[in-house]
Amino acid sequence: MTAMPRRTLVDLGVALAALALVAVTLEIWTSAFHVPPYLVPSPSSIAARLWTDAAMFGREAAITVGEASGGFVVGTTAAFVAGALMAQSRFLERTLFPVAILIKLTPIVAVAPLFTLWFGFGTGPKIAIAALITFFPMLVNSFVGLRSADAQELAFLQTLGATRSEIFRMLRVPSALPFLFSGARISLNLALIGAVIAEWTGADRGLGRVIFVANANLDLTALFGAVLALAAIGIAANAAVGAAERRVLHWHPIVMTT
């Protein structure tokens, strides 16, 4: 029980050391070669901006996280339901999968302005874009995971007279859990990207808007600060999913061997 936290702390320490090395190298490079701050700001100036405007970055980050979280919940829930239906019916698989492919191939950057035009500048379009971009990865993982149930275990439950709902609950869902957590990791990051893209196309709040305005004003310290804030949010989200996965799937070989 103690090996996992120790391994996690070691991994975190290595990651932080690598980030510190990159920051120190960049600081030395920008200082030694007198790199103009309007091209590449020094890490110290970015850190100072983050400290000075911490309240603003925190406020805008909370808005983006809320939009991404809403889109993640809506998109992954819809994807799981669709994946479950496809796993139970060949007809629905042939019917729904082409629609899912169409959603996957639709450029989000092209759709986002339309959502803003149709639904306004509120939170709804941002959540919709985040949901749209998270849908396909969770759909595929749900479908494959629910279909991955062991054939012998499935036959055994059928001989016991288990209903389809009982088989789904007792066999298919547990078999799909590793796939669902994998899909959640991908979808969380995509939800964040979707929220930022939506904020670029029509918003007055959020980290995406901060990046858009900072880029227009050549305010690179604010731009890099917002990017770092988004990176920190993504890292925290992945860490949360990883912790939940280890807690729920502590019995599974995929967790026990990592």
Over which residues does each language-model region extend?
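Transmembrane-helix boundary motif in ABC transporter permease subunits
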Residues: 70-100, 117
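Glycine-rich helix-loop "coupling/hinge" segments at transmembrane-helix boundaries
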Residues: 117-118, 193-229, 249-258
